Design a protein with these regions (language model features):
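Cytochrome P450 fold signature focused on the C-terminal beta-domain
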Residues: 265-273, 289-308, 387-405
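Cytochrome P450 catalytic-domain helical core, especially the substrate-recognition surface
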Residues: 2-28, 75-202, 419
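Conserved cytochrome P450 K-helix E-x-x-R motif and the immediately C-terminal K′/meander segment
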Residues: 17-35, 273-309
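Conserved cytochrome P450 K-helix/beta-meander segment immediately N-terminal to the heme-binding cysteine loop
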Residues: 320-346
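Cytochrome P450 catalytic-core helices
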Residues: 237-240, 248-272, 368-387
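N-terminal membrane-proximal hinge/A-helix region immediately C-terminal to the signal-anchor transmembrane segment
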Residues: 1-78
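Cytochrome P450 heme-thiolate "Cys pocket" and heme-binding signature region
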Residues: 344-408
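Conserved cytochrome P450 catalytic core segment spanning the I/J/K helices
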Residues: 190-252
Length: 419
């Protein structure tokens, strides 16, 4: 007889409020309480949910025979963060076909190009910052990344209020777990930018030369699905936003990188005139150590038995991304900031999962992870080697229930000067 056991259960008719109140630590707190990496709870109106963590759990979670993504994300997340019918919601051949389109954009040359564009925009911003008494790095980084990613994707911005566009792209990921007016603002920003990009798609398909034929915008607008059909204009807009929005969200990591440089001066000192390997380790440790995505959702595709528990078709399962990155069985001293730990990391796709795990093509690991790393390396290099600044007294605390979590002050810099 196969081994089975009853899972621990987090009592309550609906634990959505505790989940929101505890944020990144909700699953970890209960894993510690139950002394088990898997437990049952009720969320989203009393729906039964399985929460789990660990390397083996991630391997199972990213098994496409056992789990699907369609229908997993709550509607409020689709209405702000992901959009309808984007690559994150697809499964099987349709997902692999769409994901390949994205991965084909992530060539070595294109990753260097986006990093170069970010550095160019950062240098332009430096000229302005030098005239200012202080700047808020998080908001300024959003503006820099908005300009750079629009140039990289080939999105024409003549006559566009770039500060407003930056705000709208930020609204989409900042409002994902919010309620009330903040969430409404995120939905409205998505609707407006989708309409803007749908009009561009129509222009491209009418033969108007609004962008180059080798740009990501053109490639997505003319992409055909597995049936040979052009994507719906709204889906094109969603997928172009799947390049714009996550790139602007790297501003969260830039603020967290600045916090790491401030809090760990010994680690910063090692980056002065260091090689790319040292920067890569610092980037990876920043992504491991600080909170970014809290969980990943999926739905059981068909009944199966794993780790003594019968997973039933249709059950919602949450993988603890933050918890995996701090799991004591996966990381030595998980709550310490140690970039050198990545010197001996085996590059497993299932332990280090700040932006999801598994395979890039067949699985649901974030297609923009390489872009994120490339941009972060370049920005950290600028902050260490190409500019001076003072970090004044301010509230640099991180909220473990606010998603995304950034320093409360937005990370204020004073007396910014280029070196």
């Amino acid at each position: 007889m196969p081994y089975r056991e009853e899972l621990p259960y987090d009592e309550g008719l609906d634990n959505t409020i505790p989940f929101l109140n505890e944020g990144y630590l909700y699953i970890t707190n209960r894993r510690n309480r139950f002394n088990r990496d898997m437990f049952k709870t009720r969320l989203l109106g009393g729906k039964q949910v399985i929460c789990m963590a660990g390397k083996e759990a991630a391997e199972v979670f990213y098994d496409n025979e056992k789990f699907k993504r369609h229908g997993a994300a709550p509607n409020k997340v689709l209405h702000t963060l992901f959009g309808q019918d984007g690559v994150q919601t697809l499964d099987g051949e349709a997902h692999a076909h769409r994901k390949t389109m994205f991965m084909n954009l992530m060539t070595k040359d294109s990753l260097t190009e986006i990093a170069d564009l970010v550095e160019e925009e950062w240098k332009h911003a430096l000229t302005i910052w030098e005239q200012e008494e202080q700047i808020e790095l998080y908001e300024e980084a959003k503006k820099i990344l908005t300009k750079a990613i629009c140039r990289w994707t080939g999105v024409p911005t003549d006559g566009v209020d770039m500060d407003k566009l930056s705000e709208q792209l930020g609204d989409m990921y900042e409002a994902a777990e919010k309620i009330g007016m903040k969430h409404f603002k995120g939905e409205l920003s998505r609707k407006k930018t989708e309409k803007w990009l749908m009009n561009m798609t129509a222009s491209i398909r009418e033969g108007k030369q609004i962008t180059g034929e080798h740009t990501p915008l053109y490639n997505i607008a003319t992409h055909r699905d597995i049936n040979g059909d052009l994507l719906d204009e709204k889906v094109v807009a969603v997928e172009v936003l799947n390049l714009l929005r996550p790139t602007v969200a790297i501003s969260v990591y830039i603020a967290l990188s600045a916090l790491a440089l401030h809090d760990y001066p010994e680690a910063k000192e090692k980056l002065v005139d260091a090689d790319a390997v040292a920067y890569k380790r610092f980037v990876q440790e920043t992504r491991r150590y600080y909170p970014f995505f809290p969980v990943a959702p999926a739905i059981v595709k068909q009944d199966f038995l794993w780790d003594g528990y019968d997973f039933k078709e249709g059950t919602l399962v949450l993988l603890d991304l933050y918890g995996n990155n701090h799991h004591p069985e996966l990381w030595n001293e998980p709550n310490e900031f140690i970039p050198e730990r990545f010197k001996d990391w085996d590059k497993s796709p299932f332990d280090f999962i700040p932006q999801g795990g598994g395979d890039y093509i067949t699985g649901h690991r974030c297609a923009g992870e390489w872009l994120t790393i490339s941009v972060m390396q370049r920005c950290i290099n600028i902050m260490v080697n190409k500019m001076d600044y003072i970090v004044p007294e301010q509230d640099l605390s991180l909220s473990m229930k606010k998603m995304p979590s950034i320093p409360k002050s937005g990370f204020i810099l004073e007396h910014v000067r280029r070196k």
